[in-house]
Curated annotation (Swiss-Prot):
It comes from Maricaulis maris (strain MCS10) (Caulobacter maris). It is found in: Cytoplasm. This is Adenylate kinase. Monomer. It comes from the Bacteria. Belongs to the adenylate kinase family. Pathway: Purine metabolism; AMP biosynthesis via salvage pathway; AMP from ADP: step 1/1.
Length: 188
């Protein structure tokens, strides 16, 4: 099964992805983690990624799709993938559909985690302090939310036309959100 965890920065995609990996054995394909790893590696690609992320902007489709494509064989072997932070644009969604179709599979479900903006900012500022994430200043967080609503939120209609979107309240405890996701995945 291939699922997309969808929602604004700080809604809990990473936390819930890790939980699904532990419970179901699927592979987490977190573009945020992959991009932070590339950044930390200090390669030419990592330096380009750092400059883009530090400005609160989206990394190019070509870079992100290349990172995802490299991990698809691992996901197939595990029986499924959780796409966390990908796709972020309609072009990326179309590319993902094609990548999966070429491998005889598809996105089975899109879980939209719903959290209000002020809660998102509070969560991200706290995470930045706890984890030392230089890309999570309050100004950059607000810019990331603007980018999300302008460029990524329009994906909801793209996947809704395919009948794949299931909204889950992301404002509860981690366990409550996990229960909401589990219920959504059982829906047909």
């Amino acid at each position: 099964m291939n699922i997309v965890l969808f929602g604004p920065p700080g809604c809990g995609k990473g936390t819930q992805s890790k939980r699904l990996v532990a419970e179901r054995g699927w592979v987490q394909l977190s573009t945020g983690d992959m991009l932070r790893h590339a950044r930390a590696a200090g390669t030419e690609l990592g330096r380009r990624v750092a400059a883009i992320m530090d400005g609160g902007n989206l990394v190019s489709d070509a870079i992100v799709i290349e990172l995802i494509e490299e991990r698809l064989p691992e996901a197939k072997a595990a029986g499924g993938a959780i796409f966390d932070g990908f796709p972020r644009t309609v072009a990326q969604a179309q590319a993902l559909d094609q990548l999966l179709l070429d491998r005889g599979t598809q996105v089975d479900s899109v879980i939209e985690l719903k959290v209000n903006d002020e809660e998102l900012v509070q969560r991200l500022v706290k995470r930045a302090e706890e984890e030392g994430r230089p890309d999570d200043t309050e100004d950059v967080i607000r810019k990331r939310l603007e980018v999300y609503y302008g460029q990524t939120a329009p994906l909801i209609p793209f996947f809704a036309q395919q009948g794949k979107v299931k909204a889950v309240d992301g404002m509860g405890s981690m366990d409550e959100v996990a229960a909401g996701i589990a219920a959504a995945l059982e829906e047909k």
